Amino acid sequence: MKFFIDTADLDEIRSAAELGMLDGVTTNPSLIAKIVKDPSNFTRTDFFDHIAAICDLVDGPVSAEVTSLDTASMIKEGEALAAIHDNVVVKCPLTIDGLKAIRHLSEAGIATNATLVFSPSQAILAAKAGASFVSPFVGRLDDISTDGMALVEDIVDIYDNYGYMAEVIVASVRHPQHVVEAARIGADIATIPFSVISRLAVHPLTESGLKKFMEDASVIKP
């Protein structure tokens, strides 16, 4: 399974890359907003420059999301995003207009990521429209007392049944168990916030065991 980081923060991307586990990056407008220091002066050029900076850090797909709602505007924006770097993947929302944009962009050879997917039927439509990636949001489903990982399992099974080529990105990851379940189910990718990446390596028995080892190591004299 591939690991993407779900952030627009360059420092977090660098830190994840240093672990040797980073295969790509996903961003969205909310993540971009978090890194903007002065919203009154953040232009589209600044946004494109920031995506380019991310692409320079990572040798893998970098998802950048359109901010339009109608098909024509999504296509225009998607083409501009794709021109930033060969690694850019254009994220489009799973709406009727978004599906039309995905179809158009995919036929033009532009990689696409169908985002805000919350049902198997949406995932089927994304695959049939030619999406390169499909992003089910597991945490947001868990938030409304629905089993987000069950959705991932359904999508993986359906895609396997019919040989759909879209890669499944488990998104809206809230804790390490989401990552483990994604791997168990057979999802292609988990896109993970840096806070969760940091927790993947942590276990209390590792900490207590290390403490005991260090205490016992005191018998070894210089």
UniProtKB/Swiss-Prot annotation:
It is an enzyme of class 2 (transferase). Gene3D superfamilies: Aldolase class I. Its EC number is 2.2.1.2. Pathway: Carbohydrate degradation; pentose phosphate pathway; D-glyceraldehyde 3-phosphate and beta-D-fructose 6-phosphate from D-ribose 5-phosphate and D-xylulose 5-phosphate (non-oxidative stage): step 2/3. InterPro entries: Aldolase_TIM (IPR013785), TAL/FSA (IPR001585), Transaldolase_3B (IPR022999), Transaldolase_3B/F6P_aldolase (IPR004731), Transaldolase_AS (IPR018225), TSA/FSA_arc/bac (IPR033919). The keyword Cell cycle does not apply. GO terms for molecular function: aldehyde-lyase activity; transaldolase activity. Pfam families: TAL_FSA (PF00923). It is found in: Cytoplasm. GO terms for biological process: carbohydrate metabolic process; pentose-phosphate shunt. It catalyses: D-sedoheptulose 7-phosphate + D-glyceraldehyde 3-phosphate = D-erythrose 4-phosphate + beta-D-fructose 6-phosphate. Transaldolase is important for the balance of metabolites in the pentose-phosphate pathway. This is Probable transaldolase. Belongs to the transaldolase family. Type 3B subfamily. Keywords: Cytoplasm, Pentose shunt, Schiff base, Transferase. The active site is at K91. One of its GO terms (cellular component) is cytoplasm. It comes from Chlorobium phaeovibrioides (strain DSM 265 / 1930) (Prosthecochloris vibrioformis (strain DSM 265)). PROSITE patterns: TRANSALDOLASE_1. Signal peptide: none annotated. Coiled coil: none annotated. SUPFAM superfamilies: Aldolase.
